[in-house]
UniProtKB/Swiss-Prot annotation:
This is Casein kinase II subunit alpha. It catalyses: L-seryl-[protein] + ATP = O-phospho-L-seryl-[protein] + ADP + H(+); L-threonyl-[protein] + ATP = O-phospho-L-threonyl-[protein] + ADP + H(+). One of its GO terms (molecular function) is protein serine kinase activity. Belongs to the protein kinase superfamily. Ser/Thr protein kinase family. CK2 subfamily. PANTHER family: CASEIN KINASE II SUBUNIT ALPHA. It comes from Spodoptera frugiperda (Fall armyworm). InterPro entries: CK2_alpha, Kinase-like_dom_sf, Prot_kinase_dom, Protein_kinase_ATP_BS, Ser/Thr_kinase_AS. PROSITE patterns: PROTEIN_KINASE_ATP, PROTEIN_KINASE_DOM, PROTEIN_KINASE_ST.
Amino acid sequence: MTMAVPSRARVYADVNSQRPREYWDYESYVVDWGNQEDYQLVRKLGRGKYSEVFEAINITNNEKCVVKILKPVKKKKIKREIKILENLRGGTNIITLQAVVKDPVSRTPALIFEHVNNTDFKQLYQTLSDYDIRYYLYELLKALDYCHSMGIMHRDVKPHNVMIDHDHRKLRLIDWGLAEFYHPGQDYNVRVASRYFKGPELLVDYQMYDYSLDMWSLGCMLASMIFRKEPFFHGHDNYDQLVRIAKVLGTEELFEYLDKYHIELDPRFNDILGRHSRKRWERFVHSENQHLVSPEALDFLDRLLRYDHYERYTAREAMDHPYFYPIVKEQGRMVSSNSPTPNALQGPISTTE
């Protein structure tokens, strides 16, 4: 077993080391429990592997909220999720944690969140226009750049964890249960993210990954949306998942990545990987999706779906890509139309112009 070559995030690598220990040391965190009686469950919204989610009413102010009742899981994991949510509170497009209480019956913790109209992206995102795809991905990138700048990787970016209130064009990144603090040189568990959104680093068991994992997942969402193919990489298990990726990005390119980081491939891949050439993105375009595809969309996609995590666009770089020019232009226009004009600040307009 050779040692894999270490890797370090291209951005925000040292943010946690520049903060006091309390910021990232979630195991020492002491939870401030709120009052459970303040919340009344209204209806069940869904259930996940680790929790059940309800719509509720905060009876102190009559406002709707969302209650996530956690299933029995290690205290450490619960503390991690709470600490991360506390650290990110108020961040752009990050779901707001309002309180943490104990369920009186089960004694399990329940997280109280702001209420978001419960359409997850999954139901919506195969029906969006070209402009809407750009708009919502830009909003999602704001959330990712924010959490990365705060030293946190989400590690479960997928449509199901992106809540959209389409009427108000509001987006929230939810479910921080797999999120983790980034410390350069640390080895992380590769059993994170959902199969179709797992980066190659997870599938080849490379543990020294970073924020760039989230950018692969975002790339999978983009591909799925512009090509109207859900999911884009449809593996039947984690091994097949890498094969599906290799059929698009190429096997030669995969081996270059493995060589660069001295990664040894699980022998189980020997019989299933085969040899595949890299495919051009254009080959996924057809009459049903061509209205969503543009040269800049394909260029942007190509900068996200890279084997080498170090080469992938960061969230900030992604936001500066020409794909988002129409959005940036529109958001700039809205900002300037809401602020006083320079003339209004300068008194009478001179007539010499």
